[in-house]
Amino acid sequence: DHALATRQVALPTVPEPTWAEPGTVGSPMSALDTHFVRLVQANPQLRPRVGNPDELRSNKLDATLDLLKHRVQVPEAGVAESRTGAVITALNEEAVVCAALANKGGLNLVVTYEAFAPKMLGALRQELIFSRHLREAGRPPGWLGVPVVLTSHTWENAKNEQSHQDPTLAEALLGEMADGARVCFPPDGNSAMVALAHSLR
């Protein structure tokens, strides 16, 4: 079956995370990057799709980009690009989140700066409503969850500061029913890897 037609997806094989030892310092996004790559490699039957408006490398998803590559019409030599790439990058937040939401039979990840995420809210809410209606009709959705990862958080105050910060999406999703949307704030790499695996259920 084509990934776009598949609606009942078995839970993926989730590799054991590469745990960081207590007291070590590391980037939660780098840990998530490594774990997502291992998740994709452990599940070749699931078509991967990564939605990203901009700056996947700045978000420390280097291994994901190197493996899956930007989808482009004319790939440049020496750049992580391919005509069949699984990373959909466009300065259109609605388009990239919808690329992941439409991949019902696949393994998805959406990553964006926090300030760009509110533009994804409409599509995410419609997906939540559609899924809830399916459950109420006795035909619960059988696809995997779509993790949406926000970076440059309001409380982080790194190099991009306020221009990349806006907690609107997290606040809006906290108001949704917990049966359809979960909001997590992983404080470190270990919890980020667990949150990623848990979000697929």
Model-predicted regions and their roles:
Residues 1-200:
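Thiamine diphosphate
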